[in-house]
Amino acid sequence: MKFPSFLSLGIAASTTALAALPDQKPIGDTIADVHLGKFLIELAPGDTRWVTEEEKWGLKRDGRKFFDITAEVEQNLFPRAFAKTAVTFPTDLHRTVEVMPLAAQLSKDNMFSHLTTFTSFHTRYYKSETGIQSATWLMKQIQKTISSSPASNARVEKFEHPWGQFSIIATVPGQSNKTVVIGAHQDSINMFLPSILAAPGADDDGSGTVTILEAFRVLLQSEAIAQGNATNTVEFHWYSAEEGGLLGSQAVFSKYKQDNKDIRAMLQQDMTGYSKGTLDAGELESVGVITDFVDEGLTEFIKKVVNGYCDIPFVLTECGYACSDHASASRFGYPSAFVIESKFEHSSQHIHTGQDTIETLDFNHMLQHAKMTLGLAYELAFADI
């Protein structure tokens, strides 16, 4: 996600702390460096440049967002040539009778417990050893969630990447191959020294990670979902390397496009836990529905989901080009949407630093995101889309 407007750590303070921190030796380079160690990034449609890795972090420190499209060059992919999947979304909610009792099972305690452990890894930087360890821990929690549910056909798999940390995909088969995707990114980063300094990443995006995990747990408690009677298949994704330029999600959706996978909708949950910025601004607590670079029809339906299943309203906000993993789905022609914790300008200023800790989060607010996620997943699982 974005970089905070203030630089509270300070380079001098960061350097002083280095000796006390564990060694985070990078696993290896990302995708092959075809330009002498540089990477091709896209900051806006058609605005590309070759940069070093340090220049990537410098851009992010300045609040610039981008795709790292080096892999497209290597694989001769041309995403803009892909036809956009045309989907007509429902005009109203049809599953409130089933969803409301499920939503009552969502647990703040579960999210707190999972996030406490998830933020205890020194960093979840995608090229670090602890980034692999955190992904391994997360995958075990997802497998436990499946094993303790009645959904015997549900499964979880690694999606491997060359940089170390893998993405994770959990699948709940339905009656068709039409697929609804719920996503979050599991990696974290400290923008001062990514491979060395602590990056608890509680809000960005530990909050989204545990929010969709809790929605996944409760979704599997539905007898109709567990028995595979939903009209559509539902997948939950936890992406690696979002902070490096949406690398993990691009790899996933590129593979899906090459495999002709029928993705009908994708919702991203990135930063779901910070409400203080909104309240400090004297505004009502709300969730932020992103309106730029998203699918209009899916976004309109999400507004109905928030109104129907959440206890707080939505506000409309923008986050810019390539601002989270939903942009990768859009890039490869799939309808996508993004809901964040607030208006973009009121979102957490602690991210990408060592201060992005669990103490800054509001788990009641995260529960609202979990309700929205569960409601959307269930509604679209049974929708004719």
From Swiss-Prot:
Q: What domain of life does the UniProt record list for this protein's source?
A: Eukaryota
Function text: Extracellular aminopeptidase that allows assimilation of proteinaceous substrates.
Give the residue range of the signal peptide: 1-19
Enzyme class, spelled out: hydrolase
BP GO terms, sorted: proteolysis
> Which GO MF terms are attached to this record?
aminopeptidase activity; metal ion binding; metalloexopeptidase activity
Q: Which UniProt keywords apply?
A: Aminopeptidase, Disulfide bond, Glycoprotein, Hydrolase, Metal-binding, Protease, Secreted, Signal, Zinc, Zymogen
Binding residues annotated for Zn(2+) 1, in chain numbering: H185, D204, D270
What gene codes for this chain? LAP1
InterPro entries with a match to the protein in the record: M28_fam, Peptidase_M28
Which SUPFAM superfamilies does the entry mention?
A: Zn-dependent exopeptidases
Q: What is its EC number?
A: 3.4.11.-
The record lists the organism as Blastomyces gilchristii (strain SLH14081) (Blastomyces dermatitidis)
What cofactors does the UniProt entry give for this protein?
Zn(2+)
Q: How does it assemble?
A: Monomer.
UniProt remark on cofactor binding:
Binds 2 Zn(2+) ions per subunit.
Record localization: Secreted
Sequence similarity: Belongs to the peptidase M28 family. M28E subfamily.
- Protein name (Swiss-Prot/TrEMBL): Leucine aminopeptidase 1
Residue positions the entry lists as glycosylated? N177, N229
Q: Report if keyword Glycoprotein is assigned.
A: yes
